Amino acid sequence: TKTLRNLILSGVFFGITMYSYALSYFLIPIFLICISLYLLYTKEISFRRVLLWAACVCITALPVILFVCSLLFHWETIHFLGLTISPIASERMSDVGVTSFWENIKDIIKITLTCGSYRLDAVPKFYTLYPLSIPFIVLGFIGAVYSFLVSLCKRTFQADSIYLLFFLSGLITIGLSGSGYVYRANSFFICYLFFLIKGLFLCCHFLSSYHTGFMLLLS
């Protein structure tokens, strides 16, 4: 946020990311709104720069935005810069809703941390992630929430908040759209890795007097 060049580049790259897969055009806007509000609150960015950032994202992702608008408003086929944008998947918008929001969130957390009904996603008892890592992921998540709340109280930026807000944005996206597939929640795993590392760090810090033995046990 301090360098104009980096701000513009990040906006362009976020815009490009919205082309990657179907849920990106839900996830990325939700995350950018959350992180923008957080950066504004902690005074890490000015409102003018937020508008510039948003403009870079929107210009880069304009075909995707037009596609989403064609789904929402049932527009006719659009010809834009040599692209043909047609609402060919308009019926999928009916999947978006809030009626099963909490159920969808509970299901995707279970599937990504353990296993679901699809045998190709994860083997029962071995899980998607190693069972030993799950308590540390939970601990790291709690630690990230605590850091986020402290940063709100002190109005200071905490890097943990980026991963936490990205994870929460993913939960909101899945909650609204619903999915029983692990690949629809790929964004979770970078957050799980961060929470795992943070959880291990918190345990090592708490058990500092037993640091060597604790690390040998984990090994």
Predicted feature locations:
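Structural signal for the C-terminal ends of transmembrane alpha-helices
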Residues: 1, 33-45, 144-153, 200-208
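Transmembrane alpha-helix segments characteristic
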Residues: 14, 54, 58, 132-176, ...
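Membrane-interface alpha helices of multi-pass inner-membrane proteins
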Residues: 7-22, 171-172
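Membrane-interfacial loop-to-transmembrane alpha-helix junctions, especially the N-terminal start
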Residues: 3-6, 50, 152-166, 212-216
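Signature aromatic-anchored transmembrane alpha helix within multi-pass, membrane-resident enzymes
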Residues: 33, 58, 194, 200-219
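Transmembrane-lumen/periplasm boundary regions of multi-pass, lipid-linked membrane glycan transferases
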Residues: 16, 28-145
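Hydrophobic/aromatic-rich transmembrane helices and adjacent perimembrane loops
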Residues: 26, 160-207
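Specific aromatic-rich, kink-prone transmembrane helix
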Residues: 1, 6, 10-14, 32, ...
